């Protein structure tokens, strides 16, 4: 994934729409699912106008707090999950190497 980044399309007090540049469903679906678990989030929409021509966008509306904070918190939670998976895999590799 080269040069992946966000572009803010629109933002107000309770909502934000973000275009995801150089991202694919592999990362975006877990992000949208994680954002939807946030109690402060009222709505989350993920859409692509045309899969070959347009970048995906997510729209987040919150009941409280800042919408960009909900996205940031979700990214941090996903990061912890993936880091935990890496740690688990490394422990398993060590365990298997010790038993040989």
From Swiss-Prot:
Keywords: Cytoplasm, DNA-directed RNA polymerase, Nucleotidyltransferase, Transcription, Transferase
Subcellular location: Cytoplasm
Any single biological process term in GO: DNA-templated transcription
InterPro entries linked: RBP11-like, RBP11-like_dimer, RNA_pol_Rpb11_13-16kDa_CS, Rpo11-like
Gene Ontology cellular component annotations, sorted alphabetically: cytoplasm; DNA-directed RNA polymerase complex
Reaction(s) the record says it catalyses: RNA(n) + a ribonucleoside 5'-triphosphate = RNA(n+1) + diphosphate
Pfam families noted in UniProt: RNA_pol_L_2 (PF13656)
Single GO MF descriptor: protein dimerization activity
EC number: 2.7.7.6
Listed NCBIfam families: PRK01146.2-5
Main function: DNA-dependent RNA polymerase (RNAP) catalyzes the transcription of DNA into RNA using the four ribonucleoside triphosphates as substrates.
Subunit structure, interactors included: Part of the RNA polymerase complex.
HAMAP family named in the record: RNApol_arch_Rpo11 (MF_00261)
Family (UniProt): Belongs to the archaeal Rpo11/eukaryotic RPB11/RPC19 RNA polymerase subunit family.
Protein name: DNA-directed RNA polymerase subunit Rpo11
Gene (UniProt): rpo11
């Amino acid at each position: 994934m080269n040069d992946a980044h966000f572009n803010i399309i629109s933002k107000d007090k309770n909502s934000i729409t973000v275009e995801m540049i150089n991202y694919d469903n592999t990362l975006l679906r877990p992000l949208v699912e994680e954002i939807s678990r946030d109690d402060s989030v009222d709505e989350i929409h993920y859409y692509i106008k045309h899969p070959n021509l347009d970048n995906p966008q997510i729209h987040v509306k919150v009941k409280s707090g800042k919408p960009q904070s909900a996205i940031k918190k979700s990214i941090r939670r996903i990061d912890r999950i993936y880091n935990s998976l890496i740690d688990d895999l490394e422990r398993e590799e060590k365990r298997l190497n010790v038993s040989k």
